[in-house]
């Protein structure tokens, strides 16, 4: 008589799941470079199971975000994850029971925010030895700095003309170029940022502007002439 019995243990199948990488720019919680939360790859389901793996809503934690995901973290490399309970499979019965889900976190990168200078114009008068006169100050474009960061433009930026521009070609070794308008010929040098959060910003100096060379004023005084009535010739040594 064989009445022996026992228990059967069915262990969970291991399911490796890797998350993809996401990229943001400091100051903007939206993804860049075509990235988004998602599953990069995973092991195949077994035992005839068929279904589509996805990420459970609300399960994501992302080191690239702070303040309840309302702001980006500082520039840097972080991770985002969901944990094993954050992976679900539509159409697979007892998915969480039958699989030991092991998740590899995805990278979450925050790039520096690129900020730009305002264009600036300059002018001079033909033949002037005083150089270019700048119309205003070198400044950052509006809304460049975010989150109340204490970052600003350092004093000392200077405005001149492009060495390879039309103004320089016309000027040569003279004090100024010919009178006229020289578009996109301004060059800004020495522009730097100062502050406590400099690592989160990248200053892009592609500012330019118009150089206007005004005509020089040339006063000309004419001499006096004298004639005698009835004779068109000059007298008194005039002429």
At which residue positions do the language-model features occur?
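Short loop/turn motifs that initiate or flank beta-strands
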Residues: 1-239
């Amino acid at each position: 008589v064989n009445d022996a019995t026992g228990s059967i243990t069915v262990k969970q199948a291991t399911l490796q799941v890797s998350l993809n990488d996401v990229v943001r720019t400091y100051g903007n919680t939206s993804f860049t470079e075509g990235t988004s939360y998602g599953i990069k790859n995973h092991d195949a389901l077994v035992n005839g199971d068929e279904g589509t793996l996805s990420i459970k809503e609300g399960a994501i934690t992302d080191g690239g975000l702070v303040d309840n995901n309302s702001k980006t973290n500082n520039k840097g490399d972080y991770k985002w994850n969901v944990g094993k309970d954050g992976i679900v499979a539509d159409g697979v019965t007892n998915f969480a029971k039958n699989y030991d889900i092991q998740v590899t976190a995805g990278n979450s990168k925050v790039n520096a925010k690129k900020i730009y200078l305002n264009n600036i114009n300059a002018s001079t008068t033909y033949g002037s030895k005083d150089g270019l006169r700048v119309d205003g100050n070198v400044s950052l474009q509006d809304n460049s700095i975010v989150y109340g960061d204490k970052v600003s433009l350092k004093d000392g930026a200077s405005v001149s003309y492009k060495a390879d521009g039309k103004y320089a070609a016309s000027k040569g070794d003279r004090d100024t170029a010919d009178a006229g308008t020289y578009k996109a010929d301004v060059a800004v040098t020495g522009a730097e940022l100062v502050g406590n959060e400099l690592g989160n910003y990248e200053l892009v100096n592609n500012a330019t502007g118009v150089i206007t060379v005004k005509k020089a004023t040339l006063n000309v005084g004419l001499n006096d002439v004298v004639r005698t009535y009835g004779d068109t010739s000059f007298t008194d040594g005039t002429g």
